[in-house]
Each structure stands twice: as structure tokens, then as C-alpha cells.
Amino acid sequence: MNFIQDLRLLLKSRYPIILINTREEERLEYIIKNQLFCLDNEKVYCWDFVDGYTSNPNDNGYAKRNPLLALEFIEKLDTPYLNLFILKDFDSFFNDLGLIRKLRNLSQIIKTQSKNIIIVSCKVNIPYTLSDVITIVDLPLPNLSEIKKEITRLSIALGIVLDIELVNNLAKSCQGLSVERIRKTITKTIAQYGQLDSRSLPIIIEEKRQLINQTRLLEFYPYKKATEDIGGLDALKSWLKKRSRSFSKQSFNYGIPTPKGLLLVGIQGTGKSLTAKAIANDWTLPLLRLDIGKLFGGLVGESESRMREMVTIAEGLSPCVLWIDEIDKAFSNLYSQGDSGTSARVFGTFITWLSEKTTPVFVVATANTIQNLPSEMLRKGRFDEIFFLDLPNNEERELIFQIHLARIRPKSWQNYNIKQLSLLCNKFSGAEIEQAIVESMHTAFSEEREFSTEDIKIALEQFIPLAYTDKEQVESLQAWAGNGRARNASL
């Protein structure tokens, strides 16, 4: 079901009070007045704290700055019409006990009348005493079809001719933006270039990046890495290559279900985060990085609200890759009593969304340990696959040396004795190998000469890898993966 069908069903089923979570008040009003309540025997009343009721000339300004009076108006209104009352930001008054009582009483009264209340809010924070009275619905961001219609409407209004391919490209770039933000961005582009063309795309993407970063939950992450930049992990690469077209229309028509994502468990520095970036690059999808710690807020209900906001943004930008780094740290205190169950509720919401989502949001979660991972997360069906990224073997270490040296010395990397170096760094991670190369460069640069194989050898000999400093943890993780609990990322 889509939003309109869901809302129509709730109204027909006599759900008295519905809270719609959205920042797009204007778009919501348009949908309600033009697609839901558009008949002569249907009336829509809009109220806000500053202007009171505004939709009906006979009641303009009524109940201004008086939310209780606004509810009394609903109770006393006696008309033969179907009535819908849109109350904006009404949740701001949920700390008023008298108003809460009035809402509960009113919900019982209007069940038998042709009245419904819609509360419009950009956050969801309902007191427990109203949880059985108010039903929450999210207004999703405009889909591709809606965006195309809006871009076409704007171009016609501004006298600009667009071909179908450009409309499609602009619409894809605008995914994740509200209708109002799309209008502003398109207008900004026209003001700069005098028309809409391929030059518009970077402006739209930058607008999207700024908007997403403003949420402080998600970061529109730049990526310049491909799977070719990762040394080894051939089993994981093969798995990803097989699914590179999983979000295409052809895949959908073939009947392939939308991929859920991956859980990458492994020792630090083995390429988990790099893999997330490479997936987005290879699949040409936007990469969103979630700081899952920022989901947790200090106010009651705030964490759950942030989780819903994250889902709305990610799904609005789909198809995309959602990268959740070090997810094991976020839910380490899942069953503790110190946060009044907030972690458990947020985790439950996340797991439910992960299991049931149908939108093409490919989740890549990384974890350095398994001790803190809840067993529910490791259950089959949460992710498409769980991969274990172990310390690289000798062949993979050679490839890692080659990748790094070819990047910094593209013309002379073959002068380095890579085979000898890879034998000297058993139990080194890829990140540790890179750090040893950087250290050798510092040494040579300070002596005003080119760094050599010998410099790298000395750096490796002085380096103590994590496999020795945290031996117990590394061996524990390897034993866990060795028992068949995860698929090895290397062949």
C-alpha cells in the first residue's frame, strides 16, 4: 500500500486521531484536499497556534493561540458533511494534562461522528497516555514519479523544454528531497545557468549533501574507492559482482527480491569500511553513513523519532547504500537497565525495518567484535549474508602492497620487492601494511631521498600489529568464524 491508500483506509476505519510525521505541510494539505477530501460533501479545516482556523471564511482566526478551544470547536461543530481537522504542531501541547484528557474524551466522541483529526508534526513524541488513541503514519518523501511530474510542471511554468532523458536524470538526482526543496533547487539552477541541463546535476547533488548532513544522523559520504582498490577478499567481491544489478528494473521483473544488505565482521583494518565505499562506487549508488550513536537522544521518545527520520531519509534516497560503521558498539548495552529500555526499542525498530523493508536500501554494517552483537542480529534473514574478514594471507598481502605502491609510485612500484615484503608481515592487516609504507616514506623524506624496500622492511620490523597486542580478541574472532558462523570473505 502507498501513503494515500493507508490514510484512506484509516479514515474509513474510523481511526479518530492520526499523527502524520512530515515536514511537508503544504504537500500533505495538497494530497488531502485534492486526492482524499475533494468532494462537495467533504470539508477540511486547518488550524495552527498563530492563525487559528484558516480554511473556512466563517471561522477564520477562531481558536487563535488556544489549542483547547480548537478541540472544543471540533466537538461542537454540527454539520452533515464529512469533516477532517488538520492541527499543525499540535504535539507541542502534549505536556498539558487538560489537553491530553480532552483529546482522549474527544477521540471517543468523534468515533460515532463523521469527523477525523490529523495532527501534523515533524517529530513523533507521543505520551504513553495517548498511545492507544493516536495512530502514527509517515508521509514518505516524493517518489520518482512525483518528482518527474513536479520537474515537468516547473519546466512548463518557466517555459523550458526538457527531453525525457534529462527529466529522468534530474528526477533521480532529486530523490531524497522534499517537493519544496526540489522547487528551490531547480529555481536556483535556472537562476545560475538560465536553463536546465546536465550542469544542474552537481548543484542538485550538493544541495542534497548539505540537507542530509544537516540532519546530523546521516552523512552523504563521498567515495572514490572501487573493489579493485581492495587487496584480496575475492569471495566477497564475487558475491557483490553477482548482485551488482540487483536494483535494476530487469532484476525486479525477473522476480529477485530486493537485497537487504551485508554484515561484515572482522579484525580492525581488514577492509570493512573500504568495502562499503567500494560497493557504492561499483553499483553507482549514493552512500549514506549513519552515526548510529546519534540516534540516541536524551528526551523520552526522541531516539525512536530519530530512527524513523533516518529510515525516511534513506528510503527517500533509495536505491542507495546505507553504511553503519561499528554497529557492535552502538548496541553493546542492549539489555542493561540504565537507559530505560531505549537501546532495546531502537534496536527492535531497526531490526524490524531491516527484515521487512522493501525499498532498495542496501545496508552494510561493520563490526569489530561479536561479543557485543545481539544474537537477533546474527539470525538468518536479517542480512543477506554475514562475511568474516580475516587477516590477509601471503598472496593477499602481495596484492595490498602492489595497490598502495602503485597508487603513490605509479611509474616505479615494480622496483620494490613485494614478495619479500609480504613474507615479513605475517599477521599484519591491510591498514597496518599501509601505515608501514607511510612510515618508510616519512623516514626517507626526512633524509631527502626516495624510500626503498629496505625502508619498508625496517618499518615493518618496528611495527607491532594488533594480532599481537590484542591476541586473545583476534584469535577469539577467528575461532568464532571458523565454526561456520560466517562466510569467509577470502577464497
Swiss-Prot record:
Keywords carried by this UniProt record: ATP-binding, Chloroplast, Nucleotide-binding, Plastid
Cellular component GO terms held in the UniProt record: chloroplast
Domain of life assignment: Eukaryota
Main location: plastid
Gene3D superfamilies: 1.10.8.60, P-loop containing nucleotide triphosphate hydrolases
Amino-acid positions noted as binding ATP in the UniProt annotation, renumbered to this chain: G266, I267, Q268, G269, T270, G271, K272, S273
Pfam families: AAA
GO molecular function, one term: ATP binding
InterPro entries: AAA+_ATPase (IPR003593), AAA_domain_protein (IPR052381), ATPase_AAA_core (IPR003959), P-loop_NTPase (IPR027417)
Keyword Chloroplast found: yes
Locations listed in the record: Plastid, Chloroplast
Similarity field: Belongs to the AAA ATPase family. Highly divergent.
PANTHER family linked: YCF46 PROTEIN
Name of the protein in question: Uncharacterized AAA domain-containing protein ycf46
Species this protein is from: Porphyra purpurea
